Regions:
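Tandem CBS (Bateman) regulatory domains
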Residues: 26-47, 87-126, 130-138, 157-181
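Short glycine/proline-centered loop/turn elements that form peptide/ligand docking sites
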Residues: 48-49, 58, 82, 149-150, ...
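The C-terminal cap of the DNA-recognition helix in HTH/winged-HTH DNA-binding domains
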Residues: 10, 66-67, 135
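A structural micro-motif recognizing beta-strand termini
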Residues: 53-57, 121-124, 146
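A glycine-centered beta-loop-beta connector
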Residues: 65, 73-90, 133, 141-164
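N-terminal helix-turn-helix
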Residues: 1-16
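Minor-groove-contacting beta-hairpin "wing" of winged helix-turn-helix DNA-binding domains
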Residues: 15-26
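Amphipathic alpha-helical dimerization/coiled-coil segments
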Residues: 37-67
C-alpha cells in the first residue's frame, strides 16, 4: 500500500506531511497533463528542416522528399530565406496535370507561396502550434526566425509535424515528459 501511495505522491495527485498523513492535492491527471504540455515550447519539440532551393525542379523536390523521408519540403531563396512549401499533395497535383513535366517545371510553380503559409517560432507553445495544424488541416509547420521585425522575411530553423506531436504524447504517457525541457 505504501508503494502505491508513493507513486501517487510522485505523480502529484497526493501529498504527504508528517503528523498529517496523505491528502489529495486537488490536481487531476488531465490538469497535470495540460500543465506539462503548456510548459513545452516548439524549440523543445521541433525537428530538422528539409529544404530545396527555389531554382530546383519539382522532380528534385520529389527526390529530396523521398530521400529525407518527409512529407513536406521547404523552398528557400538564394538568401536562404523561406519562399514557400511544397507538399506531397502539391506534387501529386502537378504530376497528374498533363501540362507539367516534373523534371522541367520549377518547384516554385507547384509550391504554396510564402504569402499563404502559416508559421511558428521556436518560442511558441506546442499547444499553439498544434492548434494551427488542426485549424488549417496541414501536416507540417515551418519553425522560423523573423529576419526583420514587421516583415515576412523568415529563416527556417526547424519544422514541427504531426509525428512530433504524436511522439510527445507517447513520451508523456510513458512518463518521459521531462525530456522536452
Amino acid at each position: 500500500m505504501r508503494s502505491d501511495l508513493a507513486i501517487l505522491v510522485m505523480g502529484g495527485i497526493l501529498d504527504a506531511r508528517p503528523k498529517v498523513g496523505y491528502f489529495y492535492t486537488g490536481k487531476n491527471t488531465l490538469g497535470m497533463l495540460m500543465e506539462e504540455i503548456s510548459g513545452i515550447c516548439v524549440r523543445d519539440l521541433q525537428s530538422v528542416p528539409v529544404a530545396v532551393n527555389h531554382d530546383k525542379s519539382a522532380y528534385e523536390a520529389v527526390i529530396t522528399m523521398f530521400l529525407e523521408d518527409v512529407g513536406t519540403v521547404f523552398v528557400i531563396d538564394d538568401a536562404g530565406l523561406l519562399a514557400g512549401v511544397v507538399s506531397r499533395k502539391d506534387l501529386l497535383k502537378a504530376a497528374i496535370n498533363n501540362n507539367y513535366n516534373l523534371r522541367e517545371v520549377p518547384v516554385v510553380m507547384v509550391m504554396t507561396p510564402l504569402s499563404k503559409l502559416i508559421v511558428v517560432t521556436p518560442e511558441d507553445s506546442v499547444a499553439a502550434a498544434a492548434r494551427k495544424i488542426i485549424d488549417n488541416e496541414i501536416d507540417c509547420l515551418p519553425v522560423v526566425r523573423c529576419i526583420e521585425e514587421g516583415s515576412r522575411s523568415y529563416e527556417v530553423v526547424g519544422r514541427i509535424t504531426k509525428t512530433n506531436f504524436t511522439r510527445l504524447l507517447v513520451d508523456l504517457a510513458e512518463g518521459k515528459g521531462g525530456n522536452y525541457r
